Amino acid sequence: MVGEAIPANGAKPHITVRDLTMAFGSFVLMRDLNFTVNHGDVFIIMGGSGSGKSTLLRHMIGLIEPAKGDIFYGDENFTKAEPAKRQELLRRMGVLFQTGGLWSSMTLAENIGMLLEEYTGLSPTEIREVASLKLALVGLKGFEDYYPSQISGGMQKRAGLARAMALDPEVLFFDEPSAGLDPISSRLLDELILELRDSLGATVVVVTHELASIFTIGNNSVFLDPETKTMTASGHPKELLAHCSDPTVRAFLRRETVSESLQDSG
């Protein structure tokens, strides 16, 4: 299961990562990454601490340039795209970072509205209506005029998700969405991610180390191994749990030590 994930059931590739190397100067973090995210996937980027999960996400949205390799969205080479084409591709993406990405000095509606004001020709009334709709989609109807400090951490994450959806993205990226949430709020956020994937027809990419989320929402994944500095497995998380022979992957998915995983496989 090492190498590029194969599209299942005729699914079309949405994102293709090809021969990607991530490095900071002479220090190589990950090399030779090859995988495909298919349309409609909830794709999990997983791995141990220091494996570069969040760094990979930042490469995929253009915040960091690769030392080598390319990232494609459909047939478009995002890595080598001209600035105008890259901006066009970026408008098709929504991102929820760990903190939620909300401006504390703005209301929830204003947080969403600033993107609509910058990238659309909507009137102030229309912007308010769209902001209200996005908040309603994440269960925050009636919270338009609340400030982030006035709502809970779980609600802030949902408001951040509403902001990420402001421009109707084709791809949603989540960086450790469950960070700082209690188990109930985390489960509710997982359910919301699946609901939005289904209702919006979006592709979802999630960085997480939470096994509950990995097995609940993920249908495709890649495992980054900091020891070998490359990907050591890809595919459906439940299939990897059942059949992957790599001891590090097995240990991660079973919450075992590597030595325990080797004993189990022996």
Label every PLM stretch briefly.
Residues I61:
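Helix-to-loop junction immediately C-terminal to a conserved catalytic motif
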Residues G69-F78:
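Conserved ABC transporter NBD signature motif
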Residues P124-F143:
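Conserved ABC ATPase "signature" region
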Residues Y147-I151, M155:
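Conserved ABC ATPase signature
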Residues A166-E170:
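A short, proline-enriched helix->beta-strand linker immediately N-terminal to the Walker B motif
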Residues L172-D175:
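Catalytic Walker B motif of ABC-type/P-loop ATPase nucleotide-binding domains
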